[in-house]
């Protein structure tokens, strides 16, 4: 009887290994497509689904493993925590988990599509229905310029924060939130503070918007937790 050879060994060369949990048919298809389109160096630097390329760990795999998701989501609901822990390599990395947004694409999928379309630094990606800015975050991580547009002001806020937060200065953020009581009082006012409305280039605006998004996330969670199903989802 002929010895059985696992599918992965049939598809990929020796010392190439997929990221744990890559088992859906569409994921295998995208991983193989990346493998066929990208060079070995590009696979190491850009691949969404490969863990090892000729024995070398990919940037995506190493980046995801740098995060302590248990600590990041220690105050999240059980469902949210499990969602991002299970999606460590697909949904829970970088700034994608800053605000839960239903209906968004898996970031890992978007990264693979950018690779398959051979979009590289120097190109510009346009996303006319940006939602939670998944495309812009992935483009940013790959060194690609992007333009995101959405009719929703909230999606605009979310997208700005998720891209800004990729390289924010932690000490500056800490200095803004150190007086949390005063900041919360400003956020709870009916009139939005001026620094959220200014159109001028203000370096601190991104930090204030980051705090605002965190506040809205916390308020939303508190509201959902203290309300009945009928109130949250009226028929």
Per-region residue spans from a language model:
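Alpha-helix N-cap/helix-initiation motif
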Residues: 99, 128-129, 148
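Glycine-rich SAM-binding Motif I of class I
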Residues: 133-137
């Amino acid at each position: 009887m002929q010895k059985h050879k696992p599918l992965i060994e049939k598809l990929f060369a020796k010392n190439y290994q997929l990221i744990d949990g890559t088992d859906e048919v569409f994921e295998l298809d995208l991983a193989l497509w990346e493998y066929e389109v990208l060079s070995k160096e590009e696979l190491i630097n850009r691949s969404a689904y490969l863990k090892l390329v000729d024995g070398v760990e990919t940037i995506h795999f190493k980046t995801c493993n740098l995060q302590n998701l248990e600590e990041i989501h220690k105050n999240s609901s059980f469902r949210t925590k499990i969602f991002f822990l299970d999606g460590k390599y697909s949904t829970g990395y970088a700034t994608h988990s800053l605000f839960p947004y239903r209906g968004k694409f898996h970031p890992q999928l978007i990264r693979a599509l950018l690779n398959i379309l051979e979009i590289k630094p120097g190109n510009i990606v346009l996303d006319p229905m940006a939602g939670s800015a998944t495309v812009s975050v992935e483009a940013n991580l790959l060194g690609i310029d992007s333009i995101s547009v959405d009719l929703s002001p909230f999606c605009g806020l979310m997208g700005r924060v998720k891209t800004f937060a990729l390289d924010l200065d932690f000490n500056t953020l800490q200095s803004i939130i150190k007086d949390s009581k005063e900041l919360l009082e400003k956020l709870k006012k009916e009139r939005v503070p001026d620094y959220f409305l200014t159109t001028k280039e203000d370096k601190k605006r991104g930090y204030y918007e980051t705090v605002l998004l965190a506040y809205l996330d916390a308020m939303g969670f508190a509201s959902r937790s203290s309300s009945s199903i009928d109130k949250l989802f009226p028929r």
